[in-house]
Amino acid sequence: MYNGLVHLHSALRWVILILLIVSLIQAFTKNEKLAKTSLWLLISSHIMLLLGLFQYFNSEAVGFHMIERLGGFGNVMKDSFARFWVVEHISVMVIAIILITMARGRAKRLKFSAAAWMYVIALVLILAAVPWPFREGIARPWFPGM
């Protein structure tokens, strides 16, 4: 089951990135379809958050249980692999999803500029916190199961 959740979580990243880029373009071009696109982005990002939180608190490999396994939070912070999964990934992604949620509120009221900048910041945060294949030590494949 855990492998399936990791694959779903990984595949959903592409959906979110595509929707985020489309929403960003719509916000900068003041396209009124942003209200609908931003809703799909909001839904998919919250599903991703729930999947991620489930993995964080239930996985023995990465996440919350790693603190205990490594003998405390101080040891987690010394290990770059553990620090990424226990602190950096979840913190940055939660902030990005908060920004996506706030931008959705702006998009509903057709406040394009505010939504656009929140989407830009969310996109930068997501790109920084994804375990891309070229990131040494924390790499995950481009597509799940590869």
Predicted feature descriptions by range:
Residues M1-M146:
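Membrane-embedded alpha-helical bundles that constitute the cytochrome b-like, heme-associated redox core
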